[in-house]
């Protein structure tokens, strides 16, 4: 076999292996919990109808203050029953979206669940040892959590994203009609 043919074969195989790795790695996501299972966790079998806050005025201003001015939505979707709200929010960690569910009860976070984790770094935010830090947290002064959230080495952006989403869930809970945290 000539050197040229070997070169072509090696090149084609290398490109195939590289593209296979790249495609599967770029599509990789870790689905931890489905939306339906998250809502069952929040409300058991009696899941309320989804509601929404229109993304304008105070809702828009507050959300963009927490998440950044480029945060745009049409509606902030939530589920509410007996003073408890559930929120499914997304935020980019370092490069890819983190989808998380937040349950707010009595103006405090009662639990956080990572639904889909797409990042290759910072995966520790998926585990209860990190998420449980948020349980019982509420907002003070309109912009801070009343609890200090410990970071994770190498996962600063994922931790910051989870913290911002927690603040957003708490703040939006307060804006839902029939709730009053202030």
Annotate each PLM feature.
Residues 2-12:
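Bacterial N-terminal signal peptides that target proteins for export
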Residues 10-20:
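Bacterial N-terminal signal peptides
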């Amino acid at each position: 076999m000539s050197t040229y043919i070997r070169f072509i074969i090696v090149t084609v195989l290398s490109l195939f292996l590289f593209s296979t790795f790249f495609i599967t790695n770029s599509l990789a996501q870790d689905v931890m919990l489905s939306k339906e299972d998250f809502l069952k966790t929040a409300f058991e079998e009696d899941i309320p109808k989804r509601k929404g806050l229109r993304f304008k005025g105070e809702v828009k201003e507050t959300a963009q203050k927490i998440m950044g001015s480029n945060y745009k939505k049409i509606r902030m979707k939530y589920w509410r029953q007996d003073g408890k709200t559930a929120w499914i929010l997304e935020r980019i960690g370092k490069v890819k979206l983190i989808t998380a569910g937040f349950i707010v009860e009595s103006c405090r976070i009662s639990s956080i669940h990572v639904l889909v984790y797409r990042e290759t770094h910072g995966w520790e935010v998926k585990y209860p040892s990190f998420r449980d830090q948020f349980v019982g947290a509420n907002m003070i002064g309109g912009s801070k959590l009343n609890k200090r959230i410990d970071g994770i080495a190498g996962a600063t952006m994922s931790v910051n994203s989870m913290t911002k989403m927690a603040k957003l869930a708490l703040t939006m809970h307060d804006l839902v009609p029939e709730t009053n945290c202030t």
